[in-house]
Every structure is written in C-alpha cells, then in structure tokens.
Curated annotation (Swiss-Prot):
Top EC class for this record: hydrolase
GO molecular function terms listed in the Swiss-Prot or TrEMBL record: metalloendopeptidase activity; RNA endonuclease activity; zinc ion binding
Entry cofactors: Zn(2+)
PROSITE patterns, per database record: UPF0054
Domain of life: Bacteria
Subcellular localization(s) per the UniProt record: Cytoplasm
Cited NCBIfam families: rRNA maturation RNase YbeY
Gene name linked to the record: ybeY
PANTHER family: ENDORIBONUCLEASE YBEY, CHLOROPLASTIC (PTHR46986:SF1)
The protein's name: Endoribonuclease YbeY
Length: 161
C-alpha cells in the first residue's frame, strides 16, 4: 500500500450523447477510490461507448460477438526506456453505456452505483487484478466491496453467492 496523495489524470470521453451518463468528475472519483493506497500516480482514459462500438471492440480484442459492460486495456510500456523511468500511464477503460443500463435495470441496481462498480472493477484490472479462478475472483470481489463501501455504495455482489 502506498501512502500520500494520488496524482491522477483521467481523460473521459463520450461516444454518445451524455444525457443520463455519469460526469467526468464521477468517473475520476471512482478511479481515485480504486487506486487509493495502491498507486501514487496514474494517467488513464475512460471512454463511454454505444453498443455498436462496444461490440466491435469486444470482437476485435476478445473474439466475442457481443458488447460487454467494461473492457480494460492495460498500458504497455515501450521498449528502450531508460531504467528508473516509470511512466504513470495505466491504460484505458471502455464502458458500454447501453449494457450498463440494461444490467442495472435487470439486477435492480442504481445506475450510478453500477457505473461506479464497473469503473472500480475495470481499474483493478488495469492494476493487474483478475478473476480467472474462484480464489482470484473472491479476492477481487472483496476488494471491490471495500472500495465501494468507502464510496457509500452497497455490495454489488449481494445475493449472487
């Protein structure tokens, strides 16, 4: 765990009308909560997309023919950087607004809480967390619960296990 303030640069872009979508300030708050105590500085991008772009990206990068709620693209540092130079570039998050809205409605969740959860979830992926097996999934879900609780958001996994 790192202590002290986080230097954070979150570029938020919207590929569809912003009405009803979280503000850039909200996305920054959620990313900062996920990074708190884990990393001192980070630059990342959040792009909110429609279903067509979400499906295209999921197909291209994961071979899946459907849009998913969040995609995480960790940054890869270029070869040949002098030793000791650490780039704060963390990566990119792509959040598919129609999928998030549909899931929130189907699961009876507040839309803003679901966006917060998926932003935290995606940011943790950028930090190297994963859920490929049950042990990893439980550890990641517990961390998500703690981060969201700090934000005043209920357990997103309540009733699932």
């Amino acid at each position: 765990m790192t202590k002290g303030p986080v230097r954070l640069d979150v570029a938020v872009s919207y590929a569809l009308p912003r009405a009803g979508l979280p503000s850039a300030v909200s996305f920054r708050k959620w990313v900062a909560a996920a990074l708190k105590g884990r990393i001192r500085e980070a630059d990342l991008a959040v792009r909110v997309v429609d279903e067509k772009e979400g499906c295209s990206l999921n197909h291209h990068y994961r071979g899946k023919d459907y849009a998913t709620n969040v995609l995480s693209f960790p940054a890869e540092l270029p070869e040949g950087l002098p030793k000791g130079i650490k780039m704060p570039l963390l990566g990119d998050l792509v959040i598919c607004a129609p999928v998030v809205a549909r899931e929130a409605a189907e699961q009876g969740k507040l839309l803003a809480a679901h966006y917060a959860h998926l932003t935290v979830h995606g940011t943790l992926h950028l930090l190297g967390w994963d859920h490929e097996d049950d042990k990893e999934a439980e550890a990641m879900e517990q961390l998500e619960r703690e981060i969201l609780a700090d934000l005043g958001i209920d357990d997103p996994y309540a009733g699932e296990h």
